């Protein structure tokens, strides 16, 4: 596999733009591609705002931010993929759209260029069906917001070579991330864990055990603090496997096993209350509270990352 100097990212949304600044911050030349010029303009604004936050938090200097911004190019020209040493795609989460994209792009790049998708749960093996030389294709699942969260899931499809997976893994290390290698499965590992937690949280609220506010506080002031430092298997070892086995023996059968989204989540989807993105979800985000929540999230995530990992 070739050395990596220029990285081309497809999709200039929240994930793609944040990935672009992460690569550029770590010295890579980046081309951010999107079919919509307006998406590229929004990406520029978002990246600049993220840099202002990092300057304010003392993560980068003005000079470093300026240098990073100069490493990013923006384009709607698909021919730019011919210049890529590595490609990562972060376009809409629909299999047919990803198929159309990769069928074209995988035939534009050189045969030794490793290709990755940022899908959060679609099958790597199925996406690879339209990839020229699928052995060089794998998953590179970044976690929102990508410029702050350290974890990256490296997902191996049925045809992903060990060499390609290692290239993706090593690249994640180069940009100061914590990669983990997982095999292809619906939702991979992170989203299976995340959605299992969400299902039980919904079940708790629906059954009157606790309010949404109480559940959020339990995570923020209890489990969240614990899991920021220790994984669930480490927690079990420290607490005693006999203790956890005893609790599991009577509690597992009472936990939710719902097979479809239900109750308060389904109700909000029906009302088109999608969360911060349109002003209402489980909480209200009108009158500027949407921007406040995003700013709070990024500021607190940044502080936590500095405390935990530096």
Where are these regions (language model features)?
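NAD(P)-dependent Rossmann-like dehydrogenase/reductase catalytic/cofactor-binding core
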Residues: 2, 26, 174-184, 206-207, ...
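NAD(P)+-binding Rossmann beta1-loop-alpha1 motif at the extreme N-terminus of oxidoreductases
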Residues: 1-50, 57
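A non-catalytic, amphipathic alpha-helix used as a structural packing/dimerization or gating element
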Residues: 38-49, 97, 163-174, 214-217, ...
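Rossmann-fold dinucleotide-binding core
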Residues: 117-184, 188-192
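Rossmann-like NAD(P)-binding element
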Residues: 38, 42, 56-114, 121-122
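Structural motif
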Residues: 10, 33, 75, 90, ...
